[in-house]
Amino acid sequence: MAILLGVAPFLTIPAQADSTLACSSNEKLPQDLGTLVLASIPANLPSAQWGIDQGCFQKYGLTVKPVVVASTQIGMAGLVSGSYDLFMNTPSNLVLFMANSNFDGVIVAPRHTYTAAEISRAQQDPLYPGALLLQTIVLVKKDSSIKSWKDLEKRKIGVKSFHGSDQGGILMAMRQVGADSSKTEFLALTDAQMGPAMERGDVDAVVPSDPFATQLILGGARPVGYPQAYFAKPGVAVAYLSSAKTINQKTSAMRAFQKAILEINHLLNQPTNDSSYRKTIASVTGSSDATVAKLHLPTMSEKNVSFSEIAYIPNRLKSLKFITTRVNLSTALFK
C-alpha cells in the first residue's frame, strides 16, 4: 500500500498473514492504557508499523494509531496542539523547535542509531557499495557536474527540513573543504517530491531518506556524500518525540510505549525478522521489491536515549547559526 504524502488520516495496514506474532505473549491481558497517536514521515514509519502488526504495543496494553505527515513542521505543530501524542523525527529538529518556540519537548524512545565506525566509514569511498551507509544521502542526476561537496557552491538543494541536521551536515562538509556556502540555497521537499524536482531542474541535488534514496540510485541518481557523517555524533539518529504536557497527561501509556519500542527495536535487529520487516517497508512506502531488497537496514537502538547522545546538538546548531538561544536539555529525556 503506497502512502500519499500530506496530512493523512489514521493509517491501517493489514498485519502479516502469519498467525505467530513476534510479540505474542502467554501472559494475561495487560491493563488497557488507551491510545497514542503517532505521527511520522513515511521513511521512518515502517519500524513502528511492524511493531503494530506484530502485536508489540498490544502486549503492553496500548493501541497506537499512526498518522503520516509530510513535514517536520506539521509533526511538531501537531505535538504542540495535542493532535499527535508522538512524532518520529531527529533530536536535532526537536532542539531546533525548542529553541525557536516556547515548547518543552521530550524524547521518549529511540529509533535507529549510528556508531562511530559507521560515521567514519561514510566519509570514505565508495559511497555506495551496493547499499546506503547511512539513512540519508546527497544525490544528483547521473550527468550532473556536481562531483564533490565543493561543487555545491551556488546550488539549490532539496532537504526534508529547513535548518535540519542534513542541511547542517552539508554546510559542515562544505566548510571542511573550504567551499563557500553563502549562496547555496536549501528548499524543503518531501522524499516523494525530491526525484521529480531534480529531474525538472528545480533543484541541483536532493537529500532523501531510504528507501526513497535507494530507489533514486537504482533509477540512475549518483551519490555525493552523507550529511550525517559530518553533523552527527555516535548515538540516536531518529527518535520518538513528545511534549512535556502530553507526557504528564499520559505517563503510564508513555512508559509502556517506551518498553514496547525497545522490544520492537531488539526484534528488528534479529535476522529472523528481516523478511517481514522488508515487506512492511514496501507496504508503507510503496517502494518496489527491487528497492527494498537493496536496503541496508539500520541498527535499532535497544537502550533508552542518554544525555550524552544529544548534548552536542545545541552547540552544533549554534555554530551553524541555526539557533541563537540556550536550550535546556536537562528535562528532554523521558525516564
Which stretches of residues belong to each language-model region?
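C-terminal segment of classical bacterial N-terminal signal peptides
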Residues: 6-14
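A ligand-binding cleft/hinge motif common to bilobed small-molecule-binding domains
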Residues: 88-102, 171, 176, 204-222, ...
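Secondary-structure end/capping motifs
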Residues: 248-324
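Solvent-exposed, polar/charged alpha-helical surfaces in well-ordered, non-transmembrane soluble domains
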Residues: 46, 54-55, 77, 81, ...
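Hinge/cleft segment of the Venus flytrap/periplasmic-binding protein
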Residues: 325-335
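Short, glycine-/small- and polar/acidic-enriched structural segments
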Residues: 18-172, 176-177
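Short, solvent-exposed loop/beta-turn-alpha elements that line the ligand-binding surface or hinge
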Residues: 115-131, 230-231, 301-307, 329
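Pocket-lining segment of extracytoplasmic ligand-binding domains
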Residues: 92, 182-187, 192-281
